[in-house]
Amino acid sequence: EEAIPRKNEAQTKKALGVEHWIGDEPWHESLVRLGSQPTINIEGLVGGYTGPGGKTILPHKALAKIDIRLVPDMTAKETVELVKLHLQKKGYGDIEVNMSGGYDPTETPADSKLVQAMVATYRKAGIDPLVWPRLAGSWPGSTFTGAPLKLPAGIFGLGHGAGAHAPDEYWLVESANPKVAGMDGSARSFVDLFFALG
């Protein structure tokens, strides 16, 4: 919640190319929901005849590929079963549901040594970071935060994320922006992080 007042709604709308949030939801509620609620997205749909010309036939098969972003207290396996149960309750028990990949949700407390070292490293570089409890995206952090390791894990980097996936999405060889490190500065930031961890 403390990061919300520092995030600019107008800049975010411009970057995302949107004029309003889902259901005209207020900005604050949208950000809280982004970090605390699961999502289900349709990645693609295929059905019926898609070749050249036309065919007056009923499709015998349809395919939907979805992704579900999980939050704490959910598991990938349980979520797949809940999707199957929902479809069955709605009369679509004949739909086959397969999980082709995925992982459980992950979370590391903001007061953990790792997150505090990341914040200290950003501040050393002159950046006052926003610390979000979760990302809208997904990454296999549960590999580290879940059993058997149960280690803190997070995403860090002074590289150029370009709003895509991560702060080290790709590196600039040299950067003219003081808030975005070039390749050498990005590499040094990880050294600084290791020293901050002690």
Summary of predicted features, one role per range:
Residues 79-88:
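Short amphipathic alpha-helices in soluble, non-transmembrane regions
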Residues 1-74:
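Midchain, well-structured core segments that form catalytic/ion-binding scaffolds
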Residues 1-4, 101-102, 135-143:
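A glycine-rich phosphate-binding loop feature that marks nucleotide/adenosyl-phosphate handling sites
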Residues 75-79, 110, 114, 167:
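Residues at alpha-helix caps and immediate loop-helix transition turns in enzyme cores, especially N-
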Residues 38-39, 90-94, 122-128:
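Short secondary-structure junctions
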Residues 106-124:
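Short, low-order "capping/linker" segments at domain edges
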Residues 36-38, 42-45, 54-62, 116, ...:
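Zn-dependent metallopeptidase/amidohydrolase metal-coordination segment
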Residues 67-72, 96-111, 134-136:
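A short beta-alpha structural unit
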